[in-house]
Amino acid sequence: MMENKNLKFIQNAIKKNKVVLFMKGTKEMPACGFSGTVVAILNKLGVEFSDINVLFDTSLREDLKKFSDWPTFPQLYINGELVGGCDIVKELYQNGELEKMLKDETKLIKN
């Protein structure tokens, strides 16, 4: 069962921030290549995003997997919706969909 404090923390994080990356490490120091790739993509697009390091809290990490029904990290959320992990973000970036999504839904990227 999901810990109540973790559920509230997750919901609050994705509600208060237009773009949130739950990742291993931080945007300044990613602790895995997959997290680093997503950070690099968001930085290339010039998007401000909130990063949450999942390495220091095992219960948060496990509860986030249940919350999102996604087994791995990083997990990118835009406007409260899970976009996906590294492979999906990379594919969306390469085909231009991620930039369009960020322009249309968050207005974080200007035309």
UniProtKB/Swiss-Prot annotation:
<keyword id="KW-0408">Iron</keyword>
<dbReference type="InterPro" id="IPR036249">
    <property type="entry name" value="Thioredoxin-like_sf"/>
</dbReference>
<dbReference type="GO" id="GO:0051537">
    <property type="term" value="F:2 iron, 2 sulfur cluster binding"/>
</dbReference>
<dbReference type="GO" id="GO:0015036">
    <property type="term" value="F:disulfide oxidoreductase activity"/>
</dbReference>
<dbReference type="InterPro" id="IPR002109">
    <property type="entry name" value="Glutaredoxin"/>
</dbReference>
<feature type="binding site">
    <location>
        <position position="24"/>
    </location>
    <ligand>
        <name>glutathione</name>
    </ligand>
</feature>
<dbReference type="InterPro" id="IPR014434">
    <property type="entry name" value="Monothiol_GRX"/>
</dbReference>
<dbReference type="InterPro" id="IPR004480">
    <property type="entry name" value="Monothiol_GRX-rel"/>
</dbReference>
<dbReference type="GO" id="GO:0046872">
    <property type="term" value="F:metal ion binding"/>
</dbReference>
<feature type="binding site">
    <location>
        <position position="73"/>
    </location>
    <ligand>
        <name>glutathione</name>
    </ligand>
</feature>
<keyword id="KW-0676">Redox-active center</keyword>
<keyword id="KW-0479">Metal-binding</keyword>
<comment type="similarity">
    <text>Belongs to the glutaredoxin family. Monothiol subfamily.</text>
</comment>
<feature type="binding site">
    <location>
        <position position="61"/>
    </location>
    <ligand>
        <name>glutathione</name>
    </ligand>
</feature>
<keyword id="KW-0001">2Fe-2S</keyword>
<feature type="binding site">
    <location>
        <position position="32"/>
    </location>
    <ligand>
        <name>[2Fe-2S] cluster</name>
    </ligand>
</feature>
<dbReference type="Pfam" id="PF00462">
    <property type="entry name" value="Glutaredoxin"/>
</dbReference>
<protein>
    <recommendedName>
        <fullName>Probable monothiol glutaredoxin 2</fullName>
    </recommendedName>
</protein>
<feature type="binding site">
    <location>
        <begin position="86"/>
        <end position="87"/>
    </location>
    <ligand>
        <name>glutathione</name>
    </ligand>
</feature>
<feature type="domain" description="Glutaredoxin">
    <location>
        <begin position="7"/>
        <end position="109"/>
    </location>
</feature>
<dbReference type="InterPro" id="IPR033658">
    <property type="entry name" value="GRX_PICOT-like"/>
</dbReference>
<keyword id="KW-0411">Iron-sulfur</keyword>
